[in-house]
């Protein structure tokens, strides 16, 4: 191996971006097969390949950053910029859903009965499960901040406690959202209201599941002593992502559940 005279990380060739892209193709194709032909095979294959790719890719990053020392200050700076740009791209992703919702609701067409919610739709009560979900996510935002401060202060026990609480709240939110979908009187095929509601809240729910997966990974890494008070970007990125999920939910709650009902 040649001697490196700079602080940048020259990443070795990796198969995981390719297998990750293939799993994304299988997931989207699997969703189409599920929606149109009620077949789960391709979707389950996509989920399996996605989980394997994520695990292997995470393992490589942990090895490079924690054991091989490739994540220098300047590399961490680049990772921070990358995470910030990723979250900005996610903001615009959700902006499209809000645009679709407000475009449909601010000037309802005669086909919808000229009113919002459309004729025949019974919207969910914003003061029941949606309000509980809001309080759960806000509480999880507090607990993830507690975990971050505990980590920076070197308080390992409190960090593990706070992170476990955050994960439990994330799982509770997901369970309540699934129950709400199951009991809703309308479906994704009930016109523009059903499609905008389920696509916007469904993608947010997917982001909560992804964020919870990030936090579970951080919990495992913390139990293995991977993080220190000044070297923990993996956890920091997961915390940023969780706060983003919190903020998006507040906009969803105010727009779709409260104002939209």
Swiss-Prot record:
Major subcellular site: mitochondrion
Reaction(s) the record says it catalyses: 4 Fe(II)-[cytochrome c] + O2 + 8 H(+)(in) = 4 Fe(III)-[cytochrome c] + 2 H2O + 4 H(+)(out)
Subcellular localization: Mitochondrion inner membrane
Database matches in Gene3D superfamilies: 1.10.287.70, Cytochrome c oxidase, subunit III, four-helix bundle (1.20.120.80)
Topology class, membrane: Multi-pass membrane protein
GO-annotated cellular components: mitochondrial inner membrane; mitochondrion; respiratory chain complex IV
UniProt EC number: 7.1.1.9
First and last residue of the signal peptide: none
Top-level EC class: translocase
Keyword annotations from UniProtKB, A to Z: Membrane, Mitochondrion, Mitochondrion inner membrane, Translocase, Transmembrane, Transmembrane helix
GO biological process, any: mitochondrial electron transport, cytochrome c to oxygen
Topological domains annotated Mitochondrial matrix: 1-15, 67-72, 153-155, 224-232
Residue intervals annotated with topology Mitochondrial intermembrane: 35-40, 106-128, 184-190, 257-261
GO MF annotations in UniProt: cytochrome-c oxidase activity
Superkingdom of the organism of origin: Eukaryota
InterPro entries linked: Cyt_c/ubiquinol_Oxase_su3 (IPR024791), Cyt_c_oxase_su3_dom (IPR033945), Cyt_c_oxidase-like_su3 (IPR000298), Cyt_c_oxidase_su3-like_sf (IPR035973), Cyt_c_oxidase_su3_a-hlx (IPR013833)
Parts of the chain that traverse the membrane: 16-34, 41-66, 73-105, 129-152, 156-183, 191-223, 233-256
Function description: Component of the cytochrome c oxidase, the last enzyme in the mitochondrial electron transport chain which drives oxidative phosphorylation. The respiratory chain contains 3 multisubunit complexes succinate dehydrogenase (complex II, CII), ubiquinol-cytochrome c oxidoreductase (cytochrome b-c1 complex, complex III, CIII) and cytochrome c oxidase (complex IV, CIV), that cooperate to transfer electrons derived from NADH and succinate to molecular oxygen, creating an electrochemical gradient over the inner membrane that drives transmembrane transport and the ATP synthase.
The protein's assembly and partners: Component of the cytochrome c oxidase (complex IV, CIV), a multisubunit enzyme composed of 14 subunits. The complex is composed of a catalytic core of 3 subunits MT-CO1, MT-CO2 and MT-CO3, encoded in the mitochondrial DNA, and 11 supernumerary subunits COX4I, COX5A, COX5B, COX6A, COX6B, COX6C, COX7A, COX7B, COX7C, COX8 and NDUFA4, which are encoded in the nuclear genome.
Record-stated family: Belongs to the cytochrome c oxidase subunit 3 family.
Protein name (record): Cytochrome c oxidase subunit 3
Organism: Ornithorhynchus anatinus (Duckbill platypus)
Gene: MT-CO3
């Amino acid at each position: 191996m040649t001697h490196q005279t700079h602080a940048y990380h020259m990443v070795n060739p990796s198969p995981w971006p390719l297998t990750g892209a293939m799993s994304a193709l299988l997931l989207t194709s699997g969703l189409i097969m599920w929606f149109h032909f009620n077949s789960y095979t391709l979707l389950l294959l996509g989920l399996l390949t996605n989980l394997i790719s994520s695990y292997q890719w995470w393992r490589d990053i942990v090895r490079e950053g924690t054991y091989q020392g490739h994540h220098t200050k300047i590399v961490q700076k680049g990772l921070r910029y990358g995470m910030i740009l990723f979250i900005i791209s996610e903001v615009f992703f959700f902006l499209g859903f809000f645009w679709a919702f407000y475009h449909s609701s601010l000037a309802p067409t005669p086909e919808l009965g000229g009113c919002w919610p459309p004729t025949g739709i019974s919207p969910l009560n914003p003061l029941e499960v949606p309000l509980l979900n809001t309080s759960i996510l806000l509480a999880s935002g507090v607990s993830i901040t507690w975990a971050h401060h505990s980590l920076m202060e070197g308080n390992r026990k409190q960090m593990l406690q706070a992170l476990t609480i955050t994960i439990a709240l994330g799982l509770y939110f997901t369970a309540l959202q699934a129950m709400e979908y199951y009991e809703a009187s309308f479906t994704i095929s009930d016109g523009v209201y059903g499609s905008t509601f389920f696509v916007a809240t469904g993608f947010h729910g997917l982001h909560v599941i992804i964020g919870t997966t990030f936090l579970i990974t951080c919990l495992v890494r913390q139990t293995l002593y991977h993080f220190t008070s000044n070297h923990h970007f993996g956890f920091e990125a997961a915390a940023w992502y969780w706060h983003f999920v919190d903020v998006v939910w507040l906009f969803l709650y105010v727009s779709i559940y409260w104002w939209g009902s």
